[in-house]
């Protein structure tokens, strides 16, 4: 991992990042929040609370490499039913846009189901993104650091 500078965030830091995004996020209407596991669950709940959105859904996506084509293909372990997304505006929330694969895959799956989406992440790493033509719609900060969020402190302490 090239991001060697570990930065440990406090809950107050997370609150500041969410607060920074809220004016832009609030300028759109959403019917639901889709939090990407695991990192997006807590910021997704915080944002949903601030927007007074009752529908908070989970998207769990993993990637497996196709050895023949050397491509990563998303495997959705958990995802809302297409019929629930059709015609709806969703806000996708994750903690960080590193390579961008998770957010982009979730957005494409929502679009395929007939829904619309915007995305919000606490941190954006444009230098690591695999997508030159895509980025999060909203982000709290741009970083090159390895971010350790308050809900994953043990992970940072153990060096995982």
Annotated model-derived regions:
Residues 1-160:
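PRPP-associated nucleotide enzymes
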């Amino acid at each position: 991992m090239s991001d060697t500078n570990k930065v440990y965030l406090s809950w107050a830091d997370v609150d500041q990042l969410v607060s920074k995004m809220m004016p832009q996020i609030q300028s759109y209407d959403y019917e639901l929040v889709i939090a990407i596991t695991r990192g997006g669950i807590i910021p997704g709940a915080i944002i949903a609370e601030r927007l007074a959105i009752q529908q908070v859904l989970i998207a769990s996506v993993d990637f497996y490499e196709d050895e023949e084509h050397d491509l990563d293909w998303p495997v959705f372990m958990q995802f809302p039913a297409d019929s629930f997304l059709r015609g709806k505006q969703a806000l996708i929330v994750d903690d960080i846009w590193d390579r961008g694969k998770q957010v982009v895959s979730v957005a494409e799956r929502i679009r395929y189901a007939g829904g619309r989406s915007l995305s919000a992440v606490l941190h954006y790493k444009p230098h690591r993104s695999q997508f030159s033509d895509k980025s999060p719609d909203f982000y709290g900060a741009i970083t090159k650091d390895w971010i350790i969020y308050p809900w994953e402190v043990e992970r940072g302490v153990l060096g995982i």
